[in-house]
Amino acid sequence: GGLGIFIKNSINPTKIEVAVFNPNLNAIETSSASEFIATNEINTQNLTLESGSASNIILTTNTAALFVESSSASKQNITLNGNKNTNVNIESSSASTVKIEGIAGTGNYDSSSASSIKAGDLQLQNATTSSSSGSNIKVFAIEKLNANASSGSSTKLANKPKELQIDESSGTSIN
């Protein structure tokens, strides 16, 4: 099931605040300039976050698997209290921004269309990145990083991993 919150017959922007209590939260989706703020840490096995259309998600989580999708000028600000077994997958597109910090094991980042993944403060063991079309990624990988950049995009390294594999085309940078 899902919880939908709407203002009936309203065309004027109206700020409303809603308190929700759910001990089994495993997915959050925002759109249309809405904002989701978790006041307490979300503890769950798997967590999926999807934001679009200039919406925002702000939270702290302790999860074994995190999937993040951000598009259409939306923003996400995530603190992850994971461990070396935590998997993180982030996809950003269309001028959206995902900022994430904390600790995890493996990360897969995919950015496109002028979006940003700001993950220089998320300490990973291993990471794979793919940036394209004017997007950018900042990444922190301790052991291994596979980085791919194309079409005017960039990948910035917050540290130097033990093993680095780079695939970049002209007009891009990985450094």
What kind of feature is each model-predicted range?
Residues Q76-N175:
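Short, surface-exposed interaction patches in beta-rich subdomains
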Residues G1-G52, I58-S71, N77-N89, G105-G107, ...:
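Acidic (Asp/Glu) and glycine-rich low-complexity loops/linkers
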